[in-house]
Amino acid sequence: MNVLIYNGNGASKICLLRTFQSLLPFVVPLYAMRFVDASTLEKEPWPASTALLVMPGGRDMGYCSSFNETIYRKITDFVKRGGAYLGLCAGGYFGSAVVDFRMPDSDLNVVGKRKLQFFPGTCAGPTFPGFTYDSEDGARRASIIVDGMQSSPVHTHIYFNGGGSFLETENYSNVKVVARYQETDFEKSAAIIYVKVGKGNVVLTGIHPEFSAEGSPILDKRDEKTRLELLSYILKLLGLKVPKDTSKCGQPTLTDQYLFPNNVETKRFIEKALTNKVKNQDEDTLYTFQFSDISSEIPEHQLANLDISADLSDSDNEIVKIWYGDEEKICKKAKPSFDLELYAKLINGCRFGLPIIVAPVIRSTQTLLDKNYRFLDSTNTGFTVLGNYQTAGRGRGQNMWVSPYGTLAFSFIINVDAKNFSTTPIALFQYLMALAVVRGIREYAPGYENIPAFIKWPNDVYVRVDKGGINFQGKQYMKLSGIIVTSNYRKNVLHLVVGCGINVSNLGPTVSLNTLVDEWNKNSDNPRLEKFSFEKLLASVLNQFDRYHRLLLEEGFSLILPEYYQYWLHSNQTVNLASGGKAIIQGITSDFGFLLAQLLNENNEPTTKVVHLQPDGNSFDLMRNLITRKT
């Protein structure tokens, strides 16, 4: 499950950073944390895989100008059905029915109704005078009393800068005051409120519990312990599972990477990478690559770079150190994260999966390959990058997330020469990958064929669960895997980067393969299954992809389609089109992979009109049986 943080028009950069940093220790052990914009909220089926939506501090008017009726409806429905919403300062104003924000200069006043209306009343502010936009001139260490967090009320101080007070909370039976300002009249004292909305939970704040005392001239480090307890309490009110001990949680530091094997192809890759180092540097290159022989303590080579853009904070150029050389030493270094010796035996003969870079902690396997162009130019088909933990993972669209340990995250290269464009059905590769994931799971070993993994068009893998998933055609499903395919055309070669993430051993509440294995093993009548390993699963998936890729190029997609249909969820499904009307899914074209949908009339009877839907232009919302346009 995801925790989404809005990162679009209106969101303050510093508030985004503080929100990310403060929530990370509580969230990432159990959830994936993603940044999303208004387009994502409108067009992606995010509610089905989301536990919490966070609207950070910033400008409420920016949110209003970017959100449309579809977004408001999706957020409201998400909460009413059991989701959670956290509104911090501007996000608190935004979640109220009425905003009454008044400044000494009346031209700066913001007064009016809002559409989410989780709090049925008015959020009035600034609670304290002196606020100035884009400044800390009016910021203060607000004294508050928190009720319900412990057996008796707790006094602490929290960062304040322009936030509001929630008025007349006593008039609403579904509203509970969590914290009150101590330095205001009682009627303006509600600083944090909890609201029950349908089956869901909402917390709105006028203060900034996400701001730590670290580096702050306003806050006192003596309040940090209570601030963290307050954050934990807020997340529990929102229905999230929170680790008891967060001291060992949070985002680990980026690590060195390990290149395997030490063979002729790997050496050619390094030589080519060094040859591609030119004076006229590519503007979009993100990293400095530093290749070091593991037998030597001194780096031997460096590739030039420009600055990093993947970080949330301003930073200098980032160095990515890649060790190569002696296989025994490389395997020993990588083994805590990935057993390269075992993997090499399992992947033998496959065109994909070697050479491989193993990174215990990486920003993104996809970004490393497709946003570093000289590095990309040096790779051959099959070159693979695996990360145990991604701090800025990428999915379909332009959004990033922090993926927790237990996710098998990898990306690999397919190079297509310009002369072969007309005979290479590139659009079908994402279908092959989805099928390879399903078959890689089901053919992991004898007995695993009963793992209920299925394909959701166009590029996701879902598993059937007993409870807690999306109700689809009378059964419950949860997302297990997502796939992304990106491309770069350079020097008469189209470089395709196929990225995939599979939940293998994630901690709850999300589903993972090993939780399915645990459930299977609880039944004594079932033959006992061993838990999935990263090494064996990656080899199984890539071997399957290799088989389908060969078959596609040699025989065509029509021979693969029957097997694809065996595992996809959409045969003869009646769907709603976002453009209006309904249709019945007929299948997929064997040339370009278009989804075929036969339109229905107002009586839900088939017409003669069939529409072709592109996989890269549309998204499937299982929860609502809805196909929407995607950008």
Swiss-Prot record:
Summary of the function given for this chain in its UniProt record: Post-translational modification of specific protein by attachment of biotin. Acts on various carboxylases such as acetyl-CoA-carboxylase, pyruvate carboxylase, propionyl CoA carboxylase, and 3-methylcrotonyl CoA carboxylase.
A Pfam match: BPL_LplA_LipB
Any one annotated GO CC term: cytoplasm
Domain of life: Eukaryota
Key words of the record: ATP-binding, Cytoplasm, Ligase, Multifunctional enzyme, Nucleotide-binding
Intracellular or extracellular location(s): Cytoplasm
Entry's EC annotation: 6.3.4.-, 6.3.4.9, 6.3.4.10, 6.3.4.11
Binding partners and assembly: Monomer.
Name of the protein in question: Biotin--protein ligase
Family affiliation: Belongs to the biotin--protein ligase family.
Domain BPL/LPL catalytic: 341-553
Gene name per UniProt: bpl1
Keyword Ligase: yes
Molecular functions (GO terms): ATP binding; biotin--[biotin carboxyl-carrier protein] ligase activity
Upper lineage: Eukaryota, Fungi, Dikarya, Ascomycota, Taphrinomycotina
Residue ranges the record marks as coiled coil: none
Catalytic activity as recorded in UniProt: apo-[methylmalonyl-CoA:pyruvate carboxytransferase] + biotin + ATP = holo-[methylmalonyl-CoA:pyruvate carboxytransferase] + AMP + diphosphate + H(+); apo-[propionyl-CoA:carbon-dioxide ligase (ADP-forming)] + biotin + ATP = holo-[propionyl-CoA:carbon-dioxide ligase (ADP-forming)] + AMP + diphosphate + H(+); apo-[3-methylcrotonoyl-CoA:carbon-dioxide ligase (ADP-forming)] + biotin + ATP = holo-[3-methylcrotonoyl-CoA:carbon-dioxide ligase (ADP-forming)] + AMP + diphosphate + H(+); biotin + L-lysyl-[protein] + ATP = N(6)-biotinyl-L-lysyl-[protein] + AMP + diphosphate + H(+)
Gene Ontology biological process terms from the UniProt entry: protein maturation; protein modification process
